[in-house]
Amino acid sequence: MKTVILACDIYNPDDPKRSQEWESEETISLMENTIRSLGYNVVSLSDAKEITSVLSNIPKGNRENWIVWNLVEGYTSTSREAYIPALCEYLGIPHTGSSASVQCFTLDKFKTKLFLHSMGIRVTDSELLTEFQTKPKIKFPVFVKPNGEGSSLGISESNTIQDQGEWEDTIPKLLEEHSPLLIEPFLTGREITVGVIGNLNHYQVLPIAYVDTPSGIYHEGIKSKSEFLESLDFEVPIALQKELESTSLKIAKFLGSSGYIRIDYKLEKEIPYCLEVNATPGFSKIYSTLAMLWEKSGKSYSELLELCINLGFEEYQTHPRYQYGKDQNV
């Protein structure tokens, strides 16, 4: 019987700032039970020393029968979502999701936008701010967010800056907490989220949805582990769906993503602009949009987890990035 290790950080309600991206205990428990029902052994590990010890001690001749589900998000480091993929690749152990290189790259929103722009993907102008400057290069109003955070960390309604006075009041505080900052034009349209499942050259796009929030801004104040405070609207015009599907498939291919990613867009005059790519999306049935997009397609949560595991094993068999680790296991 094959074994799935859920390598995870577990959300701490007493420290929401640092653990906002982490999965809840309820989600980890649901994933455990669901994967176990698929016929796998399941082990959940949330201590870094224990994770590295267990992985290092998997018998070298049996590592192809283990797979690590990457749910470690960490904090502050620009490499934090790559810890598990890098360790697994080095040790020659299968893992779910994208490689360490994709994880590091997509966590840097500014570099990702520069790359996507160079590949012909529509993105807004942007600038990276590492220290205070008297005014942005982009015209007001602008939207300001941390360059390397997820789950809307560091984002509130005050991140929309209308004029010079608000800039001078807001930017020093944000730089102190979340440097560097990404500065973008404020887009007035609706947000859209797109899920892409699969490995290179075999991607599928999930049902596409608008993400609506009470204030119109997707910020940390509406993130919850107990309920979904946003709403998904799947009534997206066919022409827009086709454009987003084509663009999202290109993005997945350009990045070389594996397993699953979520891509977020925002409209301006009904034209979609890519905001960011999340290579480690959540898998909660309560608060994670990827799982909701999947279930909208008429398939079950267990089918989603099974597919993600199968894609991880498939990647292990076919992708050359594992070769060094495999050779050490002989």
Can you say where each PLM-predicted feature lies in the sequence?
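Anion (oxyanion) recognition and catalysis
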Residues: 36, 89, 117, 175, ...
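Short beta-strand-to-turn element immediately C-terminal to the catalytic PLP-Schiff-base lysine
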Residues: 129, 155-163, 196-199, 268, ...
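Hydrophobic beta-strand scaffold residues
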Residues: 42, 94-95, 123, 142, ...
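ATP-dependent carboxylate activation and anion-phosphoryl transfer catalytic cores
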Residues: 237-330
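Phosphate-binding site of ATP-dependent enzymes
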Residues: 164-243, 249, 267, 271-273
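ATP-binding N-terminal substructure of ATP-dependent carboxylate-amine bond-forming enzymes
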Residues: 1-94, 101, 105-107, 311, ...
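Active-site nucleotide/adenylate-binding loops and adjacent lid/helix of ATP-dependent enzymes
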Residues: 2-8, 58-62, 104-182, 188
